[in-house]
Amino acid sequence: MSPGQGTQFFRAGARLPERPGHDQLMGDVTVRLAGPADADSVGQLLRDFNEEFDTHGPTAAEFTGRFNTLLARGDVVVVLADDHGRDVGFALLTLRPTPYYDGSLSQLEELYVVPELRDRGIGSRILGAAIETVRAKGGVEMHINVDEIDEDARRFYEHHGFSNIEAGSNHRMLFYLQEL
C-alpha cells in the first residue's frame, strides 16, 4: 500500500475515528488533532510530563508560546486526548523529508497520558491516531527514542510494532546525541 492510501485526512479539531476494544476502558475520552487554539493545554501537558520525570526545561508559558507557532505548521502534528473537556494526554510528532523515500519520516517526540488515567488504552488510541495522521500526510516511517531503562515504554512501543532492530539486521539501532 502506498503512503496515504486507504487513510483519511484530519483537520485540527476534527474528532478522530473510534478504536474498537478500548471503549470500556476509556469511557468518554475522545482523541482529536490539536490546533493553535490548543497551545495552552499542550504547553501545560508537556510541562507536567517534564515535571513528572524531573526534567528541567521551559516553563508551561514558554512551551505555550512555542506551540502557538508549532501548531500552525504542516510538519508538526499534535494529537490530544480529552476526557469531559479536560485534555489528559497528547502525542507530539514532527515530519521531515528524506531522500530514501518519496514520503516523510516522522519523529514521535513525546507521548504522555496523565498518571491517573494510564493503563486504560488512551496512549494506544493517541498513538494509533498519530500513526493514521502521519500516514495521511504521506509519512512512511516513524521513529521514537526511548530510554533503555524505561521498560514500560519499550514494552508499549514494541506492542505497537516498533523495533530497535532494522529489518534484515540482527543488531540494535542506537541513538546518539550532541548538545549544540
Where on the chain are the PLM-derived regions?
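Conserved GNAT acetyl-CoA-binding A-motif
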Residues: 134-146
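Conserved N-terminal entry element of GNAT/NAT acetyltransferase domains
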Residues: 6-37
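Acetyl-CoA-dependent GNAT
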Residues: 27-29, 33-103, 109, 114, ...
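Short glycine-rich hinge loops at helix-strand junctions in the catalytic core
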Residues: 121, 138, 161
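Conserved active-site alpha-helix within GNAT-family acetyltransferase domains
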Residues: 124, 148-166, 171-174
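Active-site acidic-Proline motif in GNAT/NAT acetyltransferases
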Residues: 114-116, 120, 148-149
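N-terminal leader/targeting signatures
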Residues: 5-6, 45, 158
